[in-house]
């Protein structure tokens, strides 16, 4: 009985809480990659402006008490950039990584940068990702918009780091795909 009570209070806090955040791999059901567009995008860093950069969520006990934090095994900023780079390449763009929010190259179609506003996963492992995507053409900012999405790998009775990572991955994919679709529409309509 004491063991059961301890498990309920702890909320299974002994389970690993260090998920590795990955961007979803393309599957056979996804649309085929777009034909090369012969357009270059400079992908600059996304600044991490989350309120608490040390974790991506907390685990609570059955009584709603905070028991432990979910700390990603990898860098959230790199994870976001990898997701955006993947989607840009899947849409046929040539991607060059920049080093500052204003990096541009002569002949580049656009420079992309942004801000990471939120990356959180709750105890039921519903994930939320919010980024502000920015696009510059030449010296002019032509887009600055919030792209936010939720994702869920399903409710987890026994929360795991993998379930949290999968939910966040789903949320990031939804946010990034909307951002890249809007960027793509802007660049293809300006031909």
Tell what function each PLM region has.
Residues 1-12:
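Sec-dependent bacterial lipoprotein signal peptides
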Residues 59-61, 131, 148-150:
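Short intrinsically disordered coil segments
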Residues 66-74, 121, 159-166:
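Second-shell loop/turn segments in exported
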């Amino acid at each position: 009985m004491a063991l059961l009570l301890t498990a309920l209070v702890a909320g299974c806090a002994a389970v690993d809480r260090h998920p590795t955040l990955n961007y979803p791999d393309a599957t056979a059901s996804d649309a085929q990659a777009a034909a090369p567009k012969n357009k270059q995008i400079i992908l600059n860093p996304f600044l991490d402006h989350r309120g608490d950069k040390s974790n991506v969520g907390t685990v609570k006990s059955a009584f709603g008490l905070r028991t432990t934090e979910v700390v990603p095994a990898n860098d959230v900023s790199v994870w976001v950039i990898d997701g955006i780079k993947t989607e840009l390449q899947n849409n046929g763009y040539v991607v060059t990584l920049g080093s500052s929010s204003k990096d541009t190259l002569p002949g580049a179609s656009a420079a992309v940068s942004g801000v990471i506003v939120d990356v959180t996963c709750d105890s039921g492992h519903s994930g939320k990702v919010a980024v502000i995507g920015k696009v510059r053409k030449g010296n002019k900012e032509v887009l600055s918009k919030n792209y936010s999405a939720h994702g869920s790998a399903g409710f987890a009775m026994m929360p795991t780091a993998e379930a949290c990572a999968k939910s966040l991955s789903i949320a990031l994919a939804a946010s990034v795909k909307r951002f890249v679709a809007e960027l793509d529409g802007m660049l293809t309509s300006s031909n």
